Amino acid sequence: MAKRQGTRTVILENGVYIGSYSAVVGPKESDGPLGKYFDKTFQDEFLGQDSFEKAESKLQQISVETTLRKADLTPDGVNIIFAGDLLNQCIGSAYGLREMQIPFVGLYGACSTMALGLIMASTAVEAGSAEKAIAVTSSHFCSSERQFRFPLEYGGQRPPTAQWTVTGSGSVLLSQSLKGVKVNSYTIGKIVDLEITDMNNMGAAMAPRDVKIRPYPINEGLVFFYTQIQYLRGFRALSNYFKPYKFH
């Protein structure tokens, strides 16, 4: 069973494993240094749909379908799915996954949605309430611009501090199958006001220039990134950037 260690860390004692995963992206991402590692890439930002929001839903649908296919599973074999995106009412997830009829939990954590989904799915598998669970998220540059800044049709000038939101979707399948990358534990952070006043510079609030990694005396939770992530295809090129740290 799950065991709390310190104030923020939870140890998963039964063993939860990432049995399958996928990442699908749009044209800008496919042109980057990780382009060859993605499962699928698309040059059409609409993905054949008639709106950017529908295109994002399609990305999420394709990601989950790819993850299931790589695990030789159908939607009926999944007990629960934790999904989220950046749009109102999580419509990217709701419309993208509705045909699969998997028990659905909608999440909204902005850029932390994937981590939040992994935490929730891992906890469900650890507790035995799900044999197989999926965590998935998505975003789309064009739908995010409409949601948070200005629609592209408006033709507004982008400020230099405005980041470029990813067009893509990623999903992972978690189970106790005793194979794949193991999720040992997770550490939940706290709310910190970084006093970012530029409303266009949303990335600065999500990626602070420094992070406290020294553990509190009351929390000795140890979270290893390097030893697990280095084996994931798609993250192999980034493995040198990950080190084992103690988090508070």
Feature roles, as predicted:
Residues 1-53, 150-217, 223-225, 241-247:
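Condensing-enzyme catalytic core mediating Claisen C-C bond formation in acyl metabolism
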Residues 89-91, 141-146, 182, 192-196, ...:
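Short, well-ordered, mixed-charge alpha-helical segments that flank or form enzyme active sites
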Residues 24, 83-89, 139-140, 179:
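Short glycine-enriched loops at secondary-structure junctions
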Residues 7-11, 73-74, 96-99, 113, ...:
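Solvent-exposed alpha-helices and their adjacent loops that cap or buttress functional pockets
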Residues 18, 53-111, 220-241:
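Conserved beta-ketoacyl condensing-enzyme motif
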Residues 19, 83-84, 133-139, 174:
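Short beta-strand segments
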Residues 108-135, 174:
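Active-site-proximal alpha-helical scaffold in enzymes
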Residues 29-31, 92-94, 144-149, 238:
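Short acidic, glycine/serine/threonine-rich loops at helix termini
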